[in-house]
């Protein structure tokens, strides 16, 4: 969470591999043992012989350094849903093409399985067969966001980056989309990186929360702990402004 311009979306785009880092690392699906090694290195408590292990970790799990099968695995398992569903869906493509494209690119299923799989994805987000052969402009904002979510689900990812997915929607539609996302998370064991400036949405959706201010993380912790006992002055101001 954080105010507009604090770096939330840029961070999310970096995690999704859309933007390249100028410095630092982003690790995807990092094993606990490797995480322990990196934490020791950050604390300056690493032996010289472990430097090679860090290089191996970077080449295997850093999204800006992995190649080949490791990169394909990351691209398949990290998807993104954008704030502006109208701009993120091709106006020249039918819904059937938009949702089935990831399946074709990654060769997830045979050609004769594409249509049933696409219909199944639509039904999972509350749409149906009757929506297959329409263009994005023929849908409401909430329906377009459901299509974006269906596309993100197509490859059965482990992580979905959600960039303010409800901020452009009416309040009643927001609630339905949030409930849909919550249900999908439970059914599919999904992890979300949920970007928002709405603290009530963050509290409803998040297990852990990061507060950003001017491009920096100023506070992080369990959601209820941050809300009940904020430590940073900026976090306190955010919470005070929301009450």
State each model region's role.
Residues 220-221, 229:
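ABC ATPase "signature
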Residues 202-204:
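A short, surface-exposed alpha-helical micro-motif characterized by mixed small hydrophobic
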Residues 55, 113-130, 239:
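Conserved ABC ATPase "signature" region
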Residues 135-139, 143:
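Conserved ABC ATPase signature
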Residues 16:
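Helix-to-loop junction immediately C-terminal to a conserved catalytic motif
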Residues 154-158:
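A short, proline-enriched helix->beta-strand linker immediately N-terminal to the Walker B motif
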């Amino acid at each position: 969470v954080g105010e507009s311009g604090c770096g939330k979306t840029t961070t999310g785009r970096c995690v999704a591999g859309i933007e390249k880092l100028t410095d630092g690392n982003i690790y995807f699906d990092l094993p606990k043992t490797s995480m322990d090694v990196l934490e020791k290195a950050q604390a300056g408590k690493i032996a010289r012989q472990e430097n090679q292990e860090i290089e191996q970790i970077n080449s295997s799990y850093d999204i800006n350094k992995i190649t080949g099968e490791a990169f394909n695995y990351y691209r398949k398992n990290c998807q993104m849903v954008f704030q502006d569903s109208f701009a993120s869906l091709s106006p020249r493509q039918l819904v059937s093409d938009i949702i089935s494209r990831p399946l074709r690119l990654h060769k997830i299923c045979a050609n004769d399985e594409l249509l049933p799989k696409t219909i199944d994805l639509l039904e999972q987000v509350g749409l149906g067969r009757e929506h297959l052969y329409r263009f994005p402009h023929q849908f409401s904002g909430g329906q377009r966001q459901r299509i974006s979510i269906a596309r993100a689900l197509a490859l059965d990812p482990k992580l979905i980056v959600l960039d303010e997915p409800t901020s452009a929607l009416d309040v009643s539609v927001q609630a339905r989309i949030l409930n849909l996302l919550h249900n999908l998370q439970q059914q599919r064991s999904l992890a979300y990186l949920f970007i928002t400036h709405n603290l009530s949405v963050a509290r409803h959706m998040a297990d852990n929360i990061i507060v950003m201010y001017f491009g920096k993380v100023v506070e992080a912790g369990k959601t209820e702990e941050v809300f009940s006992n904020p430590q940073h002055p900026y976090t306190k101001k955010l919470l005070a402004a929301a009450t």
